[in-house]
Design a protein with these regions (language model features):
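Canonical Rossmann dinucleotide-binding motif of NAD(H)/NADP(H)-dependent dehydrogenases/reductases
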Residues: 1-34
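Conserved hydrophobic beta-strands of the Rossmann-like cofactor-binding core
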Residues: 8-11, 86-87, 133
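Conserved glycine-rich Rossmann-like NAD(P)H-binding loop of the short-chain dehydrogenase/reductase
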Residues: 29-45
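The beta1-alpha1 cofactor-binding region of Rossmann-like NAD(H)/NADP(H)-dependent oxidoreductases
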Residues: 40, 60-75, 100
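A glycine-rich helix->loop->beta "capping" turn
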Residues: 52-56, 76-88, 94-99
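Catalytic loop of short-chain dehydrogenase/reductase
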Residues: 91-100, 104-107, 126-187, 194-213, ...
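C-terminal helical subdomain
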Residues: 168, 212-252, 260-265, 269, ...
């Protein structure tokens, strides 16, 4: 199957779990996959597996906890030319602390880093049109009732718990809606998704008990990649622009907060200011 031959697709966090499965499956369909990950050593087995299967893949170092590193990574990815799909898959949970630029760690890695990465690669994504931006969110975003801005920027520390993860996942959904308000789906289609309860390294910093329980009741990465792969490759007319998909690749209701256009725009403007990009990098809503 070479239905993606000639396409370049970028997958962040592709060295393990859902990201690895996503990268391998896309490469198997003929795409050249750029694996944007923190560490080459941990990504090399994926590169080797793709090569053995006859696929094409490249590595670019990406540290989403450092916006300067994100800029360097985006510059390197941009050298690959037009991008036909960007899959913002990388994420973390339960990691205390702050990013290099002083943002709450989970919010910085799960939202601000991907926001900047997408903005910097936007010319390449437009050059690949019709193209896609797929954001891996989580059902956890539905737990949030308010969005406490003071917890995200200018903090000195953070507990990095599950609540912070939920905030960051709501930000993923809000970002998806903001992007959908700015670009037509026949140019760049976008969607976000819940991959299911997947035993991945996102939760590698949980206690042994939580990891054990999670292992009992979760899907495999192969099952968890279903929605990511579907939204990245389904026919354009079938993808609902700006929608939130469940683990079975079905459109499902999102948190009502994510339907608040004022909140969508507030996050967009703050994210642009915090990452140093123009508010109109993707156009105006």
């Amino acid at each position: 199957m070479n239905i993606l031959k000639g396409k370049t697709m970028v997958v962040t966090g592709a060295n393990t779990g859902i990201g690895r499965v996503t990268a391998e499956k896309l490469a198997a369909q003929g795409a050249h996959v750029v694996l944007a990950c923190r560490d080459l050593g941990r990504t090399q087995p994926v590169l080797d597996a793709i090569a053995r299967a006859g696929g094409q893949a490249s590595f670019v170092a990406l540290d989403l906890a450092d916006l300067d590193a994100v800029r360097v990574a985006a510059e390197k990815v941009a050298r690959h030319g037009p991008i036909h799909a960007l899959i913002n898959n990388a994420g973390l949970a339960n990691v205390p602390g702050v990013t290099k630029q002083g943002f709450e760690m989970t919010f910085g890695v799960n939202h601000l880093g991907p926001y900047l990465f997408t903005a910097l690669l936007w010319p390449n994504i437009l050059a690949g049109a019709p193209s896609r931006v797929i954001n891996v969110a989580s059902r956890a975003h539905t737990r949030i009732k308010t969005f406490p801005w003071e917890q995200f920027q200018g903090v000195h520390t953070s507990p990095g718990g599950f609540q912070q993860y939920c905030y960051s996942k709501l930000a993923n959904v809000l970002f998806t809606r903001g992007l959908a308000r700015r670009v037509k789906p026949d140019v760049v289609a976008t969607a976000c998704l819940h991959p299911g309860g997947v035993a991945t390294e996102v939760f590698r910093n949980q206690t042994w008990l939580v990891r054990t329980i999670t292992g009992w009741f979760t899907m495999t990465p192969e099952q968890g990649a279903t929605s990511t792969l579907a939204t990245a490759t389904m026919p354009r007319e079938q993808l609902q622009h700006g929608a939130y998909y469940n683990e079975h690749a079905k459109v499902t209701p999102m948190n009502p907060l994510a339907l608040d256009d004022a909140l969508v725009e507030e996050l967009w403007k703050k994210s642009a200011a915090w990452t140093g990009v123009p508010e109109d990098w993707a156009g105006r809503p």
